[in-house]
A protein has these predicted regions:
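Conserved phosphate- and dinucleotide-binding cores of soluble alpha/beta proteins
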Residues: 2-11, 15-18, 28-228
Length: 228
């Protein structure tokens, strides 16, 4: 969501107009709609009062249900029409699996929202994250919990470079030709660890307290009770 501010500046400067934006909507996206960056908003959740006022008064700001937004059972889910999605992460591993359910120690932070749905549906899924937070590397050998599988992640963007999923060699070439700093994800991991050191691996935990399923019901991972 914070990326919307910078995306608006680029779209206005380059005269780029999108068909629609979707997801949880904030005032930033409302401003982009009003300034002509998008033709419409497909809103599954208003995140601030500016979005609430817009959905009440602007006929181009459409309310949609969670099923319309992301259900694989829907005939035409909105996520399947996304060209690009920008997503965050608490952890990313070298297989491009992404964790948004827990922190690095395994403590549950919340639900994943439409993270895995949009990553699977969009033509290009981008994970935007700093290389480390609070001296903990974001890129690791294996995420604590797989929220979104690496097969659905195309690009990881950090302040030290852009890693492209090896399954997308054509995309890597196009981004490199565009002058972007393409870096192997293993190299990004090493850069982070040279700055922060290699973190201790937290204990695995006890009984299973949650099961993580993909959008079509496939078991992805489990979350275990923390041991103290």
């Amino acid at each position: 969501l914070p990326a919307a501010k910078f995306l608006k500046e680029i779209m206005l400067r380059e005269k780029i107009r999108g068909s629609f934006a979707s997801g949880g909507v904030t005032g930033y996206l409302v401003d982009m709609l009003n300034e002509g960056c998008f033709t419409s908003l497909m809103d599954v959740q208003c995140f601030d009062l500016k979005a609430v006022e817009s959905i009440r008064t602007n006929p181009a700001h459409h309310e949609i249900s969670a099923m319309q937004y992301a259900s694989p059972a829907a005939k035409s889910a909105v996520v399947d029409h996304l060209d690009v999605v920008l997503l965050g992460a608490t952890e990313i591993d070298t297989d491009f699996n992404v964790n948004v359910h827990t922190d690095s120690a395994g403590c549950i932070m919340g639900g994943s929202g439409g993270h895995s749905d949009t990553a699977a549906g969009a033509k290009l899924s981008m994970i935007i994250a700093p290389l480390f937070r609070a001296r903990l590397p974001i890129i690791t050998g294996r995420v604590r919990c797989i929220s979104t599988p690496g097969r659905d992640v195309d690009v990881v963007v950090t302040q030290r470079g852009v890693a492209v999923n090896p399954a997308k060699p054509d995309l890597a070439l196009r981004l490199k030709d565009a002058g972007l700093p393409i870096v192997d994800i293993h190299e990004l991991k090493q850069i982070a660890e040279r700055i922060t050191g290699v973190p201790a691996v937290p204990p695995e935990g006890g009984r299973v307290v949650a099961r993580v399923l993909s959008r079509d019901g496939e078991p992805l991972d489990v979350i275990r009770q923390l041991t103290r």
